Design a protein with these regions (language model features):
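Metal-dependent nuclease catalytic cores that hydrolyze phosphodiester bonds in DNA/RNA
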Residues: 1-94, 235-271
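Short helix/loop capping segments that flank catalytic or ligand/cofactor-binding pockets
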Residues: 19, 219-221, 240, 249, ...
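Two-metal-ion RNase H-like nuclease active-site motif
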Residues: 69-77, 291-301, 396
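Conserved DEDDh/DEDDy metal-dependent 3′-5′ exonuclease domain
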Residues: 71-75, 83-90, 98-105, 109-181, ...
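Conserved RNase H-like, two-metal-ion catalytic cores of nucleic-acid enzymes
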Residues: 98-100, 280-356, 380
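Helix-loop elements that line ligand-binding/catalytic pockets
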Residues: 198-250, 339-343, 350, 388
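Long, highly charged low-complexity segments
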Residues: 250-297, 302-304
Length: 489
């Protein structure tokens, strides 16, 4: 037995399809939801009093539900051992309307493929879908005291293009899709029935973001630190690896695009020592003024805004760690942790703890801490001036690495703080922490309010210790760069 989702995975990669069925990975939701999304869209569509399908329903049971109800949610159907579930079916004079709710602000035109497949499967079962709709989140909705579903959710017969504009109708998109359903089902069955699959590296393995099964398919632990596989944004590296090239410096120069970061990697590989643009690093360091504040936030993302003045997919900061270093080398730590709607207290405590002058060093700030403060400024206008002042003093500690001013092959093509820390310190490490990455911190935070007081204390300590490690790592990395610049100067 397979599901329509298996067909979609087959489109991506044989290994992804097979691993999803045989090596399923537990994944926490990226978004925090205070209630199931299905509760919200069913209320929006007035579908609380309707027929409900169940996981093992046969075609006959689903057809009976449709016969007895004007609206059926979660109806199951099967064709050639391929099952599917339709979120919402409404009876019309000439057939049925299917509605597909998306926990997204911009359901894309490629969603028409699964709608076409579902339409074909239901057609084989004697159910004619004549209209399709999507329900999606209104990105511009700003919550007031109560959640307004009529403002939060939208319904449309169109899908979004790559520029996030409603463009073609669902019907037009479906007309452009050509599906050999029988062949697709048989091909997917054949893949899933194999005892194993042989992985093949392609650009799709790391496109947009690395596949969850990448480390399952490819063990790169034995690759050299300067492996050609770690050559950032190089379009020839996979072909080169297949030809037997193992080190970055072995790649012909005419196959190197010439980005600054690539040059840093190439030189580190060629010389077998760290590459450093000393002059550029010195210029970058001159802008950093004492006292230096090393800052890091932890936050959770809410698809549906839980509190006033929040929008869909806004975040809520629940933790910060702050190390403040004075010119005489003294290092002081400040910490904040709260649950629920702690935004105002977060802002007030941060303003209080941060020095009024000096540089604020943040790792990868533009899409993280700086963006978080801008969002808070829009939610709490009375603090806008102070928050914007904080943003103006921020300097991104990741820039020297991302811009190729410093590269050590031990980084193995990675530029996260955790990847860079071991380059500058063997003693400071995340390995012994109960929480070792930001996602684990978020998932621990989500359970915080459900714990008893003793457990809450443990969760708070684990999250705070992890966040404190981030800011101390920033301190270690910055001073590591200083030592590199001063070495043999």
């Amino acid at each position: 037995m397979l599901h329509v989702s298996d067909l979609m995975r087959e489109m991506k990669c044989d290994c992804f399809c097979w691993n999803s069925a045989h090596n399923s990975l537990h994944q926490e939701s990226f978004y925090k939801m205070d209630c199931p999304f299905s509760d919200l869209w069913r209320n929006y569509l007035n579908a609380n009093e309707c027929g409900l399908g169940h996981s093992m329903d046969s075609n006959e049971q689903s057809l009976k539900l449709l016969e007895e109800n004007e609206v059926v949610c979660f109806a199951r159907f099967e064709y050639k051992e391929c099952r599917t579930k339709i979120p919402y079916l409404k009876k019309l004079e000439n057939g049925y309307m299917a509605v597909y709710p998306h926990l997204s602000a911009y359901p894309k035109e490629n969603e028409a493929l699964i709608m076409k497949v579902n339409q074909m499967i239901l057609s084989h079962c004697g159910v004619d879908i004549v209209e399709n709709r999507i329900v999606y989140l209104n990105k511009e909705y700003v919550r007031q005291d109560a959640l307004d579903l009529n403002e939060l959710l939208c319904i449309s017969d169109k899908l979004f293009n790559k520029r996030n504009h409603l463009s073609k109708t669902i019907a037009e998109c479906m007309e452009e899709v050509d599906v050999d359903l029988d062949g697709w089902i048989e091909r997917t069955k054949e893949i899933l029935n194999r005892p194993s699959v042989t992985p093949v590296r392609t650009k799709q393995c790391t496109a947009l973001r690395r596949c969850n099964y990448y480390s399952v398919c490819f063990n790169e632990s034995n690759e050299p630190d300067d492996s050609i596989l770690f050559f950032t944004t190089n379009q020839h590296k996979l072909d080169a690896y297949d030809r037997g090239i193992r080190h970055i410096h072995e790649l012909p120069l005419n196959q190197i695009e010439g980005f600054r970061l690539q040059y840093a990697q190439y030189m580190a590989s060629k010389t077998q020592k760290p590459f450093m643009d000393r002059a550029a690093l010195q210029v970058w360091m001159k802008q950093i003024k004492y006292p230096i504040s090393y800052l890091d936030f932890e936050w959770d993302t809410f698809a549906v805004p839980p509190y006033m003045n929040m929008k869909p997919f806004d975040v809520l900061c629940f933790q910060y760690s702050l190390h403040v270093e004075t010119s005489d080398g003294n290092l002081t730590h400040y910490n904040f942790f709260e649950s629920k709607d702690c935004r105002r207290h977060f802002i007030e405590q941060l303003i209080k703890d941060l020095p009024k002058a000096g540089t604020i060093l943040v790792y990868n700030m533009e899409g993280a801490e700086k963006l978080r403060l801008k969002q808070l400024a829009s939610q709490f206008e009375e603090y806008r001036e102070e928050l914007e002042s904080i943003c103006s003093r921020m300097i991104d500690l990741s820039k020297p690495f991302e811009a190729g001013l410093y590269y050590n092959s031990k980084m193995r093509g990675h530029y996260s703080l955790k990847s860079i820390l071991p380059v500058f310190s063997k003693d400071v490490s995340y390995h012994d922490l109960d929480i070792q990455n930001g996602l684990n911190a978020v998932f621990a935070y989500r359970t915080y309010d459900e714990k008893d007081e003793e457990e809450k204390k443990d969760v708070k300590e684990a999250i705070s210790t992890y966040c404190q490690m981030d800011t101390y790592a920033e301190y270690v990395v910055y001073h590591g760069l200083i030592k590199e610049v001063e070495k043999d100067a």
